Each structure stands twice: as structure tokens, then as C-alpha cells.
Amino acid sequence: MSWQQAAGYGAGDAMARRAPSVVVAGGGTAGHIEPALALADAVRRLRPDARVTALGTERGLENRLVPARGYPLELVPPVPMPRKPTPELLKLPLKVRESVKRTREVLDRVGADVVVGFGGYVSLPAYLAARGKTPIVVHEANARAGLANKVGAKFAERVLSATPDSGLAGARTIGIPLRESITTLDRAALRAQARAHFGLHPHAPTILVFGGSQGARTLNTAFSGAADALGRAGVGVLHAHGPKNTLAVQQVPGAPVYNAVPYLERMDLAYAAADLVVCRSGAMTVAEVSAVGLPAVFVPLPHGNGEQALNAQPVVSAGGARLVPDEQMTPQRVVEELLPLALDAQRLQEMSRATLSTGHREADRVLAQIVLEVAGR
């Protein structure tokens, strides 16, 4: 008699109690990595015994972000897909074969029960390596699905998306998995602490400005050019200009502080300190702003295939945000449109409710439950 039988467990019970092994593939950019890590955290909350392994490349941000969150990182060769026909296309089959082989070795070594892909350079080899051997779950964060996820969706057990119009057939819309510090954020309760943390006026209307991890020149120019008018109107600003940029702002005597910083480590406090946010509309940013119910002015990145404008559309349509094209974001636009908005408390309150109505605070838990279900654990 086996120990399982002696203890009253059947074979199925023993399998169900084995620690699940989840492999997440979402390296390259923060937009791919952060949802993967949010899922990893949610899986651990549901199954503390779970083993979560992240796939990445040697040059991606995951080399810093994944170890910092306490998860093992396995490096595989990236498979960048050229947007246009180039000589690099001739090398693609060899690169794909090498990366798939290395990825399969990782999946075997960790005993993967499920592979969860979020798009990006490491997702394609992960999907191909797992195909027919390890169940696949695909999550698409952008309003327009990328090539890797289009491929993975063809043989995935489950396909999830942030928005209904991702282009992936049969996808279930659940939003984007976010950090618990964002999904549980109570802006009103943290407001005083957040204002003190950043040295902001405790009561003045405050605008949060940021352009992603590297900042945005358009936003930097527009707001630094309007700093004097903002200060004289009694509006404070918390502005993350990017670590590679500098921002010279003359403080208006007696006015609320214009706090220009290279980078924001505590986005939860930044959101809590603000009454209005002006930012790009990457998928993660839109998801976070929606989850915390912060009125927004989105300035989509003017490059790519227009996905940033599409990401923002659900919030704009609901009345929780405005959309300003990059080329139209000027100091004059800030003074004539954004300044009056920052001073209109009633309008901001209405926008906050509308923004919150589009958010998905439970996406991390929902995705974690789906992943564990597919893994059979």
C-alpha cells in the first residue's frame, strides 16, 4: 500500500496536492513584465507552495525586475520579429530553432505544468516549445494583439485580453493583472501621506505628469513651459521627467510646489497624491489609472501602429479621460484646457467615477485562478 493510500488519498488527490510549476513569459519591456509578475504574486497568494519561473532575455528589464520580486529567471535567446523585410529575416528560422530548444530544456527542468505568455520576444519561443506538451495560457494587454500572441492563441488552452477588441478570436476580457499595491489602493486614505512624501501642498489641486520609465519630451516641454501659469493659479505638479532628462522649473513664490523628479519609485503614492494625471497611454498605464479611478489626460505615443490611442479609448468613451495628440500637447494647451480642468473639482469627481467604472481590479486573481485550473492544480 502506498503512503497516499495509507493516508486516505487517491492518486488524483496526490496529484492535486503537488506544488504547481508555472512558467511566465513576458520579457523585454515593463509592459510585458509587470503583468507577468502581478500574476506570479497572485498565484503565490492562492497557492503559497507554487513554483513560478520567469523566462527572459539577457538584455531585457526582467534582469532587474524579476529577481527584485523574488522569482527565478531563466534566460533564453530572444526572437525579435522584424517589422519590415530585412536580411535579418533569413536568420530567423535558425534563431527560432535555437530559442525553442533552449526554452524546452527550461520547461522540462522545472517540470512546467503551464506556460503563461504575455507577448514580447520570449513569448513566441515559449509557445512553440510548449506546443503539444505543456498547456498554454495567452494574455494580451494591448488593444491590438502582437504577432507572438496571435501565434500562441492558435494552440492555447485559454486566451485572455485586456480589452474586447484585441483581435484574438474567443478571448475572454479580464483586464490586466496589476500589482497589489495598485489594486488595493485607497487614494483618499493615502492622500495626506502621499502629499507629504513628495513635499506637495496638502490641499492644492495637483497634477501628476509622467511619460513612462524614460519620460516624454513632449510632456516635459509642455508642462515646464506652463509652470508659471500653473503655480500662479494655485495648482501643484508632481512631474517625473525621466532619468535621462533634466527639467529646469522656476518655482513661483508662495505657490504650490512644482516637484520635478527623474523617476517615481512609489507609483501608488503618486496616484494617491494626484487629482489629475497627464501621461502616455500604454496598456499598463491605462489599466493602473483605471483601477485607481484617477481622471486622466492621455497623450498617446505617436509611433507604432496606433495601439496607444486604442488602449485609451474605453476610458475616453466612458468620460473618464481626454485624449490629446502628441503634436497638440503644448504649453498653451496645458494653460487653456488642462489648468481649468485641474481646478474643476466637480468635473474631476465625475471623471473619477467614470474612470473607475472601466477598471479591472480583480484581473490578477482571475487570471491566477484560470492558470491553476489549466495546470490541473
UniProtKB/Swiss-Prot annotation:
Localization in the cell: Cell membrane
BP GO terms, sorted: carbohydrate metabolic process; cell division; cell wall organization; lipid glycosylation; peptidoglycan biosynthetic process; regulation of cell shape
Which is one GO molecular function term here?
UDP-N-acetyl-D-glucosamine:N-acetylmuramoyl-L-alanyl-D-glutamyl-meso-2,6-diaminopimelyl-D-alanyl-D-alanine-diphosphoundecaprenol 4-beta-N-acetylglucosaminlytransferase activity
Record's keyword annotation contains Cell wall biogenesis/degradation: yes
CDD domains from the UniProt entry: GT28_MurG (cd03785)
Q: Name one Pfam family in it.
A: Glyco_tran_28_C
Reactions mediated catalytically: di-trans,octa-cis-undecaprenyl diphospho-N-acetyl-alpha-D-muramoyl-L-alanyl-D-glutamyl-meso-2,6-diaminopimeloyl-D-alanyl-D-alanine + UDP-N-acetyl-alpha-D-glucosamine = di-trans,octa-cis-undecaprenyl diphospho-[N-acetyl-alpha-D-glucosaminyl-(1->4)]-N-acetyl-alpha-D-muramoyl-L-alanyl-D-glutamyl-meso-2,6-diaminopimeloyl-D-alanyl-D-alanine + UDP + H(+)
Where UDP-N-acetyl-alpha-D-glucosamine binds, per the record, is at 29-31, 142, 179, 213, 308
Pathway field of the UniProt record reads: Cell wall biogenesis; peptidoglycan biosynthesis
Q: Which SUPFAM superfamilies does this one have? A: UDP-Glycosyltransferase/glycogen phosphorylase
Main location (coarse class): membrane
Q: Name one GO cellular component term.
A: plasma membrane
What are the protein's UniProt keywords?
Cell cycle, Cell division, Cell membrane, Cell shape, Cell wall biogenesis/degradation, Glycosyltransferase, Membrane, Peptidoglycan synthesis, Transferase
In the bilayer, the protein is annotated as: Peripheral membrane protein
Enzyme nomenclature, EC number: 2.4.1.227
NCBIfam families referenced in this protein's UniProt entry, alphabetically: murG
Outline what the protein does. Cell wall formation. Catalyzes the transfer of a GlcNAc subunit on undecaprenyl-pyrophosphoryl-MurNAc-pentapeptide (lipid intermediate I) to form undecaprenyl-pyrophosphoryl-MurNAc-(pentapeptide)GlcNAc (lipid intermediate II).
Per the similarity annotation, which family is this?
A: Belongs to the glycosyltransferase 28 family. MurG subfamily.
PANTHER family the UniProt entry points to? GLYCOSYLTRANSFERASE, UDP-N-ACETYLGLUCOSAMINE--N-ACETYLMURAMYL-(PENTAPEPTIDE) PYROPHOSPHORYL-UNDECAPRENOL N-ACETYLGLUCOSAMINE TRANSFERASE 1
Protein name (record) = UDP-N-acetylglucosamine--N-acetylmuramyl-(pentapeptide) pyrophosphoryl-undecaprenol N-acetylglucosamine transferase
Q: Which species does this protein come from?
A: Saccharopolyspora erythraea (strain ATCC 11635 / DSM 40517 / JCM 4748 / NBRC 13426 / NCIMB 8594 / NRRL 2338)
